[in-house]
Swiss-Prot record:
UniProt gene name: rplM
Organism: Xylella fastidiosa (strain Temecula1 / ATCC 700964)
SUPFAM superfamilies (alphabetical): Ribosomal protein L13
One cellular-component annotation, GO: cytosolic large ribosomal subunit
PROSITE patterns assigned: RIBOSOMAL_L13
Lineage start: Bacteria, Pseudomonadati, Pseudomonadota, Gammaproteobacteria, Lysobacterales
Coiled coil feature spans: none
Protein name (database record): Large ribosomal subunit protein uL13
Length: 142
């Protein structure tokens, strides 16, 4: 008996719609990362992209616990001296709420070409409208 290994051409990837309204940021991000990795499928293979496509709506209505809105900071460096930019989670949620969820999920995926391919299957939108109705995503309750 041989071990089953999924092939990239034969993996069936489904589209799922996730509503982030009222969901905790970290708990939602871990479940999204698991589905992007393909760990919920019986054909999971670590070195093959077996995950599904995920469309997340209402990203601005995600919830965080504790004092993270004021105490958690996102830093980015432009490469120039003295240009370390910082903003709190609360400020980031006001400016670009979809990016907060994207950063949380991206940190839970592998670093490398396979992780980048998995990350490209995540589509996050503010509001309840999205341009993926042609794919007929199934509603996923997390």
């Amino acid at each position: 008996m041989t071990t089953f290994t999924a092939k990239n051409e034969t993996v069936q990837r489904d589209w799922y719609l996730v509503d982030a309204e009222g969901k905790t940021l970290g708990r939602l991000a871990t479940e999204l990362a698991r589905r992007l990795l393909g760990k919920t499928k019986p054909v999971y293979t670590p070195h093959v992209d077996t995950g599904d496509y995920l469309v997340v709506i209402n990203a601005e209505k995600v919830v965080v616990t504790g004092k993270k809105l004021t105490d958690k900071y996102y830093h980015r460096f432009t490469g120039y001296v003295g240009n370390l930019k910082s903003e709190s989670l609360g400020q980031a949620l006001q400016r670009h709420p979809e990016r907060v969820l994207e950063i949380a999920v991206k940190g839970m995926l592998p670093k490398g070409p396979l992780g980048r391919a998995m990350y490209r299957k995540l589509k996050v939108y503010t509001g309840s409208k999205h341009p993926h109705t042609a794919q007929q995503p199934q509603v996923l309750d997390i």
